[in-house]
Amino acid sequence: MEFPKNLRYSEEHEWVRVEGNKAYIGITSFAQAELGDIVFVELPEVGATIQQDEPFGSVESVKTVSELYAPVTGKVVEVNGELEDAPELVNSSPYEQAWMIVVELSDTAELDKLMDADKYEAMVKE
């Protein structure tokens, strides 16, 4: 199971990749493995505001429905429309093709509350 070093991670198993004042958000390889085959992804609309630690969408697998929790606060500026037709990308490419949303960061200090790859890996191994 991989946890790219250039990402930050939340306790709820979301990842964040920061590019300038924008953050790409998705779920980790650990989360998709726990969920099993993803069959549907529900995401917010462009223009919506998400709040750190609050639900912003959900993923449905053959096993369960799981809420997605915002790792940062911001305004949604892009949604990955590919996931509507191909939710299985979350299983096959959780860090590359299956980013879920892009937000304009409201407060970069929130990133300090997230874990680096080593801390996240230690948490999921407990």
Swiss-Prot record:
Q: Which superkingdom heads the taxonomic lineage of this protein's source?
A: Bacteria
Record's keyword annotation contains Ribosomal protein: no
Q: Name one GO cellular component term.
A: glycine cleavage complex
- GO biological process terms held by the UniProt record: glycine decarboxylation via glycine cleavage system
What cofactor is needed? (R)-lipoate
List UniProt keywords, sorted A-Z.
Answer: Lipoyl
> What region holds the Lipoyl-binding domain?
22-104
Question: Does this UniProt record's set of keywords contain Metal-binding?
Answer: no
Q: Which InterPro entries match?
A: 2-oxoA_DH_lipoyl-BS, Biotin_lipoyl, GCV_H, GCV_H/Fam206, GCV_H_sub, Single_hybrid_motif
Where are the coiled-coil regions?
Answer: none
Q: How is the cofactor bound?
A: Binds 1 lipoyl cofactor covalently.
Modification type N6-lipoyllysine: residues: K63
How would you summarize the oligomeric state and partners of this protein? The glycine cleavage system is composed of four proteins: P, T, L and H.
Per the record, the similarity remark reads: Belongs to the GcvH family.
What the protein does comes down to:
The glycine cleavage system catalyzes the degradation of glycine. The H protein shuttles the methylamine group of glycine from the P protein to the T protein.
- Name the record gives this protein: Glycine cleavage system H protein
Organism expressing this protein natively:
Brevibacillus brevis (strain 47 / JCM 6285 / NBRC 100599)
Q: What is the lineage of its organism?
A: Bacteria, Bacillati, Bacillota, Bacilli, Bacillales
The gene coding this protein? gcvH
